[in-house]
Amino acid sequence: MIFEIIKIGSQPINFAYPIPLLSLLAFMLSGSGYNELIISYIFAFSFFTAANLWNHLNDAEDDLNAGRNYARFLIEHRKIVTEFVVAFYFVSFLLIFFISKSKEIALLLTGLSVVLTWLYSDKIFIGKIIRRFKEDYKTEVFTYILCSFSFPLSFWTIFSEISQVGVVFTLATGFTYLSGFFLKDLKDISADIKSGYRTLAVVLSPSTLLIISVMLFIASTFVVIFSSLLDVTPTSSLLVLTVYPPILFAIYKFHKEKWKITKNIISSLKIYTYSYLGFLIAFAIGCKL
């Protein structure tokens, strides 16, 4: 049972968990030890397992109707899974409380992330009183903007006190995560309409979502480029420029199709998506050259 719970909690994949890129980037940028590297990944594992499990649990009925087999497991073990969610969130708090090098602000930011991700998904408890945040684009965007920056900043405090370098880390990874959020909404359009949600995927056109995603991703690269030119991060972090050829190629293909989501840009979307990983890897390697 525990293995199944952890497996479900690892979806969807992101660059903090189960992919350990956020930990590796912070490790290389901060120059901290391996203890911080390991603890940061445990923190990411705890937080994202809780947030993902809670989201899947609240969507279990809809997911079961959509043919997702894991949903039946969640429905049958709703109480136990809820207890695991609370436990994993609690572990996140404990790690920050004992390990963070800027404890007060990190606890505040972690608490903010926990509350927002809970309200984002919840329709079992508080969601019976107020509309859960994921069902309306205003609260959806509010949640993602705050969590995209509050989580990496609290994450950074495992490695070091808040500093200019920590702010660069937060902005670069935050804009990247936000970019992926707008891209993710593209695949949720039909499901959100069917469920009666007013999410970004419903109120904005697919073309607009794609354009915003690209702009945010470019913003994340600019953060690293300017921080390098201003000597906040190593000059070698300009290695992130190597991701521009695939990004520009993808943008060219998107523009050629007038930013419409067609089968002609599927391969370009894959290239664009892999550029996220390329950017973070290049940033991490550049910090050590």
From Swiss-Prot:
Main location: membrane
Keyword Amino-acid biosynthesis: no
Signal peptide: none
Top-level taxonomic group: Archaea
Pfam families membership: UbiA (PF01040)
Membrane topology annotation: Multi-pass membrane protein
Keywords recorded for this protein, A-Z: Cell membrane, Membrane, Transmembrane, Transmembrane helix
Location(s) in or outside the cell: Cell membrane
A molecular-function term among this protein's GO annotations: transferase activity, transferring alkyl or aryl (other than methyl) groups
Coiled coil residues, start to end: none
Stretches that traverse the bilayer: 13-32, 37-59, 80-99, 104-121, 141-160, 165-183, 203-225, 235-252, 265-287
Gene Ontology CC terms: plasma membrane
Name of protein: Uncharacterized protein AF_0771
Organism: Archaeoglobus fulgidus (strain ATCC 49558 / DSM 4304 / JCM 9628 / NBRC 100126 / VC-16)
